[in-house]
Design a protein with these regions (language model features):
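Beta1/beta-strand and adjacent pyrophosphate-binding region of the FAD-binding site
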Residues: 1-14, 32
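Core beta-strand elements of the Rossmann-like FAD/NAD(P) dinucleotide-binding domain
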Residues: 2-4, 162-171
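Glycine-rich FAD pyrophosphate-binding loop
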Residues: 7, 21-51
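Conserved Rossmann-like nucleotide-cofactor binding loop
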Residues: 14, 39, 179
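N-terminal glycine-rich dinucleotide-binding loop that anchors FAD/FMN and/or NAD(P) in oxidoreductases
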Residues: 48-73
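Central helical "cap/lid" subdomain
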Residues: 53, 166-244
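Short beta-strand to alpha-helix junction loop
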Residues: 63-71, 103-132, 141
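A conserved short coil-to-beta-strand element within the FAD-binding core of flavoproteins
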Residues: 141-157
Length: 246
């Protein structure tokens, strides 16, 4: 069984940024990244075809909005991505369409300050670039969904549904809340919340407070529609990068 100093569950922007930050800070211990998807991305994932290596479409957030003034640590993570062309400013405009199909004022009426940035060639390239800043001490376990968590005084034990795959970790980071939020009960038809089962109520008052707060957060199902228009010659001006439906 593999044993790590640190295991990060979730290869979205949060998990990948953490790993890149630890690299810059000189973290030396063996680290593992565990992700249910076939690659990094999380909420900024890009869906790749299983049969056509050239086919890929963004089906998560199409861009991220960055304020004009970023903390130096964040800027230090993003600068290599900008320099490599992996993170690029969005130049196309946004439009809003009403129920009658008419273009109306841009939504929201008072946008937050900052600029939109997107990944190239696809949005998941941002997370891939962040992981590229990590050393070869990082081991990635993709297409692996953690189902069971167990906690002892010495380590965490992680297992998949069948328990054929297992890891041990001195430290554990959940970069998403699926293993800590009741939404997993309905979404994955589990009968328990893994983190709550691993640390029974009363064992850790601080964790109890966190899980109570997290439990109060709402979760609703969302569906994404992915369209492949093929090789279409669009006329100028360029298509809007985002269309808001009101």
């Amino acid at each position: 069984m593999n044993h790590y100093d640190l295991v990060v569950i979730g290869a979205g922007l949060g998990g990948c940024s953490l790993l890149a930050s630890l690299e810059k800070l000189g973290y030396q211990g063996p680290v593992a990244l565990v992700e249910a998807g076939r690659g990094p991305g999380g909420r900024t994932a890009s869906r790749r075809s299983r049969t056509d290596p050239k086919w890929c479409i963004n089906h998560g957030a199409p861009a991220i909005k960055l304020s004009e003034s970023l903390p130096s640590a964040v800027d230090g993570l993003l600068e290599p991505l900008r320099d490599a062309g992996t993170l690029q400013r969005v130049e196309n405009h946004e439009v809003t369409i009403d129920a009658n199909g008419h273009v109306v004022a841009v939504y929201p009426a008072s946008p937050s300050p900052g600029e939109w940035w997107t990944g190239r060639p696809v949005m998941a390239s941002v997370c891939e670039g962040l992981l590229g800043q990590s050393s070869n001490k990082l081991e990635s376990h993709f297409s692996t969904r953690v189902r069971w968590l167990n906690r002892t005084p010495e380590h965490w034990m992680l297992s998949d549904q069948s328990e054929d795959w297992q890891l041990k970790a001195k430290r554990l980071v959940l970069s998403g809340n699926l293993l800590a939020h009741p939404r997993s009960l309905a979404m994955l038809q589990w009968n328990d919340v893994p983190l709550r089962s691993a640390v029974p109520k009363g064992d850790d008052p601080e964790l109890d407070a966190v899980l109570t707060t997290l439990e109060a957060s709402a979760s609703t199902v969302r569906w994404n529609l992915m369209l492949d228009l093929g090789d279409v010659a669009f006329e100028t001006p360029a298509l809007p990068w985002q269309i808001w439906l009101t």
